[in-house]
Amino acid sequence: MAKKSMIAKQKRTPKFKVRAYTRCERCGRPHSVYRKFKLCRICFRELAYKGQLPGIKKASW
């Protein structure tokens, strides 16, 4: 889990727009966040396997 202070800091509106960055809405992880879902790859995978993300299915070819 991310530091609570960093999660709180990220939720505030930055003084300059370029300072904003993505964090996972579920766990607060700052890296590998899918913008469309606002989830990191780990949380995305967990929710997708549980079927809690509508329209997402495992690829097979």
Curated annotation (Swiss-Prot):
Q: Is-annotated flag, keyword Transcription regulation? A: no
Q: Cofactor note from UniProt?
A: Binds 1 zinc ion per subunit.
Keyword Chaperone listed:
no
Source organism, top-level taxon: Bacteria
Task: Name the InterPro entries on file.
Answer: Ribosomal_uS14, Ribosomal_uS14_bact, Ribosomal_uS14_CS, Ribosomal_uS14_sf
Q: Name one GO molecular function term.
A: zinc ion binding
Arranged from A to Z, the UniProt key words for this protein are: Metal-binding, Ribonucleoprotein, Ribosomal protein, RNA-binding, rRNA-binding, Zinc
- Needed co-factor(s): Zn(2+)
**PROSITE patterns noted in UniProt:** RIBOSOMAL_S14 (PS00527)
Q: For Zn(2+), which residues are the binding ones?
A: C24, C27, C40, C43
Q: Tell me a GO cellular component.
A: small ribosomal subunit
- Tell me the Gene3D superfamilies matching this sequence: 30s Ribosomal Protein S14, Chain N
**GO BP annotations listed:** translation
Family named by the database record: Belongs to the universal ribosomal protein uS14 family. Zinc-binding uS14 subfamily.
**Stored PANTHER family:** 30S RIBOSOMAL PROTEIN S14, SMALL RIBOSOMAL SUBUNIT PROTEIN US14B
Its subunit composition reads: Part of the 30S ribosomal subunit. Contacts proteins S3 and S10.
Q: What does this protein do?
A: Binds 16S rRNA, required for the assembly of 30S particles and may also be responsible for determining the conformation of the 16S rRNA at the A site.
The protein's name is Small ribosomal subunit protein uS14
